[in-house]
Amino acid sequence: MKRKFTLLVGALLALSINASAQLAATLNWAHSVQGQTSSGNSPVSIDKLADGNYIVFSEWGSKSDAGTEYLYIDNAATSFKGGEYTGNSYCANALIQKTSPADGSVLWTVYSNYGYINSGCSHVSPTADGGFVATFEAHGLVSAKDFDNKKLFSVVQADGSSYNITLDTELHLGSSNTEAANVILKFDANGSIEWSRVLRSKVLTDIPNSPSLTNTNLNALTTDEDGNIYIAGNYRSELYIPKADNTTETLSCGNSAGWSGNAQDATGELFIVKLNKDGFFENSLLASGKSEFSDIDNIAYGSGKIYFSGRAKKVDDADVLSIDGQNINASASLQTMFYGAASTTDMKADFIKTLASVANSKGSMVIQNKNLKLADGKLYFTGSVNGGFAEDGKTEAFASNNGTMLKGFVLKADATTGDIEASYCFADSKSVSAYYGTWIGDKIVATGYDMNAAVGHVFTVLNKETLEKEETISVCNTFGSIAMIATPLQDGNTFVVGNRGKGETATILNGSETTPLAVGSKSYWGVVYMSYALNFGTTGIEKAAITDAEDAKAYNLAGQRVNPASKGITIINGHKYLNK
């Protein structure tokens, strides 16, 4: 049965954060989503559909033997019932909602009610026809009430009808889970499924942790204007991809001969695959050479190019690892971040760039590569690190966190050459932090978290040219320790974000006032989504006019970039000019 919900407060929460003279962030609306299980509630992403509405993707947990199988919206029970799981954990269900940008109200809902998803390897990407593509890493739960070892996944479409993913052969069974497979679904503008594809991987049975149940991580998804689909990640055995002629493209991993089968091990090889608009294999871009592991974490599409970022580590420094003949100069002692671009016509690499890793004070380094965004001819990388980045072949870090706690970072590179132009590493507190994406205007706003519960979800304002920090404000706290942020959406001057915390309420800050939002209880996680209108005052003009990088760039009295020949008063390099 189709059912509509108004997600929270809408226009009633038209409150304003005047955090400083620079940033005015007006709260348009906020709402919460959660299951009633102790785990399994996570924000994933917000995207904009072709018709201007939003698509919001979350994960929520259900556990039928505990009476917690129903989804809650704004802390009230709904009729949406998740997987019939009776084990000692929970079933992680997918939740996809088409919402109004005006107030966050729900236009329709799609959700899963059979099969467990890994939200870190599940994604949504809008298509030009008004629909979207969704991918899910899914596996069956042996303890599910209705377990069927040929049934992988089930989705309730927007009209209330079910769509089942059933396989021709039985799934390999572990003690509690089946093997995982990657499901690709094409939805139309009305929330109905047009087609489905399943990418299975070879399950290894002659290894210590047999059988290997998770053999491929599909880490990233994007689409182009023609409906072509791009997927990327890491595979550790063989990956089977359907082709239009009813044959199968097989990708064979060459570096995991000694793999134990533990899904947490760093092993396997990267892949980027192009599928046509019907979900069939077209082409691929793979790694060559020897490595301990290589992985693609993020991809973005723009003007016939696919941009990507990932991590790699060699077995020995003398090993050669490359993509399309261009080397990834990864370290054998520290994981290394790399990025590049390729033509979508032939999937040939334009450039590959490597960032040298600089160890922290304990001689180690961890990189969490959260997001890649293409905007205004620049690439913006966000994540967290507990070491530093240096130019390839150098040892002096241009961005560094010398401590052992992970800290959020933002890097900016030229999208044509790949050259790094600016960097920033969060240093505002002693807690763990991370950034998950950016809003790009005359300034940059990075969204992320500071695990200090008094700070929570933050917006950090950066100078667009230098990435020098101007201010950091908290937009949601007293929600436990926030440690997960949704991939955000920029829609003009609107920034739609989400986070996960644990507490009876989330406190959305508004200057000296607070706006508590009821979200579950202290015994389970809750997810909050918030829409903000971002505006900057005239004080930004002074900084915008004093650096060499700003030469010949003109601003009006409101601090907005304008054509130098525009009529009226313009400010160039700190001087006012009157054009008649």
What residue ranges belong to the model's regions?
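C-terminal tail/sorting-segment detector
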Residues: 2-3, 28, 283, 569-580
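A short, compositionally biased
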Residues: 178, 334, 405, 546-551, ...
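Bacterial N-terminal signal peptides
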Residues: 9-16
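Residue-level detector of functionally pivotal "anchor" positions at catalytic/ligand-binding pockets or at interdomain
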Residues: 534-558
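A sequence-level/structural motif corresponding to short, flexible coil/turn segments enriched
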Residues: 22-538
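A glycine-anchored, Pro-Gly-centered beta-turn/N-cap motif
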Residues: 52, 566-569
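Sec/Tat signal peptide C-region and signal peptidase I cleavage site
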Residues: 17-21
